[in-house]
Amino acid sequence: MKFYLNGQSKFDEIKLNIMLIKSEFREQEDLVPLIISDVDEIVDPIEYIAGLDISFVKDSNQAVASMVIFDYKTLEIVAKLSLNCVLNIAYIPGYLAFRETPVFLKLIEIQKCHCPHLSPQVILIDGNGVWHPRRAGSASHFGVLSGIPCFGVSKNVLYVDNITRESIQQLLTEKANEKDQFVEVKDNHGNTLGLAYNVTGSVKSAVYISVGHKITLATACQIFQSVTKYRICEPIRQADLLSRQIVDKLSK
């Protein structure tokens, strides 16, 4: 865990991170009541959707955030945007939103400036929404601050309550062991966290869909199904490819 400030001791670093966690914890608590997950507040019909992702230069705090916008009907790419940045905020598990959301919001500003006619009605983020220990992952954080309907799609299980990768794989094996099947995942109180989606037919390669903001889980699932060719849905896959291509150039 690293907090990039010059000349600080290890003790100072720990103190700063504790202060950061306390501040971010309070902000997440304040954000949760603002999340809309029981109704769709999406402009209809959907014309454009987008994927957001971020990649890092190895052993560096340099990063590239990317946004790829698609025509929803044809799934053709209509715009690509990227932003080179330096992320000086420490990565702390469970608080990823505070590191990535400001950059994603800046990308939205760039998009509105350069191609406002292509504004996406729904955004897919590589990460989690309400599937989060405090029900406020990156997709929810971004959604509330941007006001744009969005949901998260993650390749990794975020442990909440007693949910683990092994328990999810067992659940998928029992109830959704074939390609394009999914199961609803709930927390200890019976609240829905999201879907574990068996895209490829291998339970070990499932992805995890959760509501971010202004969208229901059912609608998020429908959109995911309509834009997915491989394990990773196309908007996020293309955003990832774009950011990695730029990172590769920066690394040379």
Regions found by a protein language model. Name each.
Residues V157-D161:
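Short gly/pro/ser/thr-enriched loop/turn and capping motifs at secondary-structure boundaries
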Residues K58-H117:
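A glycine-rich, hydrophobic loop/mini-helix early in the fold
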Residues P102-F142, S146-I148, N156:
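Catalytic-site beta-strand/loop segments enriched in glycine and acidic/polar residues
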Residues K15, M19-K22, L87-Y91, V122-N128:
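Short, basic, glycine/proline-bearing loop/turn elements
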Residues A90-Y95, D126-P133, S205-V211:
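Flexible, glycine/proline-enriched loop segments at strand-loop-helix junctions
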Residues K2-S37, E41-V43, Q111, T164-K252:
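C-terminal binding/interaction regions
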